[in-house]
Curated annotation (Swiss-Prot):
PROSITE patterns: NATRIURETIC_PEPTIDE. This is C-type natriuretic peptide 2. It is found in: Secreted. Disulfide bonds join C102-C118. The keyword Disulfide bond applies. The lineage of its organism: Eukaryota, Metazoa, Chordata, Craniata, Vertebrata. Residues 23-96 form a propeptide. Keywords: Cleavage on pair of basic residues, Disulfide bond, Hormone, Secreted, Signal, Vasoactive. One of its GO terms (cellular component) is extracellular region. GO terms for molecular function: hormone activity. Exhibits natriuretic and vasodepressor activity. Has a cGMP-stimulating activity. It comes from Aquarana catesbeiana (American bullfrog). GO terms for biological process: blood vessel diameter maintenance; cGMP biosynthetic process; receptor guanylyl cyclase signaling pathway. Its main location: secreted.
């Protein structure tokens, strides 16, 4: 039984190894990727293949600016949609304000309800 498990796991590892070998991307896939990314981002793809950085600095600055603006807008939407922006403060106040007595009931005086005290 143990031998079968070892052989089975060996086959699984062999299949995973063969599956993860690096293979070059076909030209058809690369063209469709370039079409999806657009001209500006396709330049990054091409420069990454050659190992060079031949992208215009103005284009790079504009792309980085667009990315930063997107991050800011996401943060604004998060703040806008957040129902309780100060939820930590509210939880802290409520926790102190609704403290329970010794037996699960809030007491005005020690031992007022049970006569035992805490």
């Amino acid at each position: 039984m143990h031998f079968c498990h070892i052989v089975g796991w060996g086959l699984v590892l062999a299949v995973l190894y063969l599956r993860t070998e690096a293979k070059p991307v076909a030209q058809a896939h690369q063209k469709s990727l370039r079409a999806l990314l657009g001209e500006e981002l396709a330049e990054y793809l091409v420069s990454g293949e050659r190992g060079e950085r031949s992208i215009d600095p103005k284009t790079r600055a504009r792309l980085l600016r667009d990315i930063r603006a997107d991050t800011r807008s996401r943060a604004a939407w998060t703040r806008l949609l957040n129902e309780h922006p100060n939820s930590r403060k509210i939880k802290g106040i409520n926790k102190k304000g609704t403290s329970k007595g010794c037996f699960g009931l809030k007491l005005d005086r020690i031992g007022a309800m049970s006569g035992l005290g805490c």
